[in-house]
Regions:
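A ligand-binding cleft/hinge motif common to bilobed small-molecule-binding domains
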Residues: 126-145
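Extracytoplasmic ligand-binding site segments that recognize negatively charged/polar headgroups
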Residues: 1-113
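Short helices/loops that flank or line small-molecule/ion binding pockets
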Residues: 113-123
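Alpha-to-beta junction loops
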Residues: 42-45, 121-126
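Periplasmic-binding protein-like
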Residues: 14, 93-97, 108, 144-165
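Non-transmembrane alpha-helical segments in soluble domains
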Residues: 33-36, 60-64, 91-95, 116, ...
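Mature extracytoplasmic/periplasmic domains
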Residues: 157-158, 162-228
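Conserved C-terminal helix/tail region of periplasmic/extracytoplasmic solute-binding proteins
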Residues: 117, 222-251
Length: 251
């Protein structure tokens, strides 16, 4: 994660989230070791999108954040001298996980959308998304089974915030600021957070809302969303993807 230094205005949140069906998985895995045990108990029904798909790479980052003994190293660009030591627990974990996956980890779905379809058809027991409200939104539209729900690891899941910015050469900066302010209003944030409308998470601090506004948000937003973990430095994305492809991409 990198600071925006006030150059952008936040307007929506995002977080890596697993999806399951309550009829199949009433007790979701709450940490990487539980996920490994779940995959062992249900071989062939778990997988993740093939990196460099954005969500597939985010899954690697999530595991690295929770498994590495050197999490502070992820706040800086990776260094050649320490990369192997920092990432060793991730590759050890994946070496154990892959034989338990769909097609024994020799093939991976191209996208989260493909995983959603495989969850709906019963091929998979888990899907994955970068929106904690995705399961609600897709269940409401009929694209996922009605009993689909989102979950994450109890210690937290990788997340970020998306922003709007006004170009330096914009011709109507005053009007653009009005729009940016409107997008941060409780009314707009609630509307877009509603899974039947969009399902894009709010960036508002609930403590700064009125009681009526908090109740309105609570009615549409799940209250069991796990804590948000900041993303590693952006340079880790390419480093992890290249190493993943070197290790597993030729299967």
């Amino acid at each position: 994660s990198l600071p925006t230094d006030g150059a952008e205005s936040p307007w929506g949140g995002a977080q890596l989230t697993f999806i399951a069906r309550r009829s199949q998985t009433p007790d979701a895995p709450q940490n990487p070791q539980a996920l490994l045990a779940f995959a062992a108990a249900h071989p062939g029904s778990v997988t993740y999108p093939r990196p460099p798909d954005f969500t597939g790479t985010a899954f690697l980052e999530q595991l690295l954040l929770t498994l590495t003994p050197q999490p502070d190293a992820l706040r800086q660009p990776p260094e050649e001298a320490t990369f192997a030591a920092v990432t060793a627990p991730l590759w050890h974990y994946l070496d154990r996980l892959h034989p338990l996956l769909w097609r024994q980890g020799r093939d991976f779905p191209a996208s989260p959308a493909r995983m959603d379809a495989m969850l709906k058809s019963g091929t998979l027991r888990l899907s994955i998304t970068f929106n904690p409200l995705h399961a609600q939104q897709k269940a409401a539209s009929g694209e996922l089974p009605k009993d689909s729900y989102g979950f994450g690891f109890s210690e937290g899941m990788l997340g970020n915030v998306h922003f709007v910015a006004i170009p330096a050469n914009a011709r109507a900066t005053a009007g653009a600021k009005v729009v940016a302010n409107f997008l941060l209003s409780p009314q707009a944030q609630l509307r877009k957070a509603d899974p039947t409308v969009w399902g894009d998470p709010s960036v508002l601090d609930p403590a700064k809302l009125t009681e009526k506004e908090r109740q309105a948000f609570n009615a549409v937003v799940p209250q069991d969303i796990p804590p948000m973990l900041g993303e590693p430095h952006a340079a880790w994305v390419d480093a992890l993807e290249q190493e993943w492809l070197r290790r597993y991409g030729t299967h």
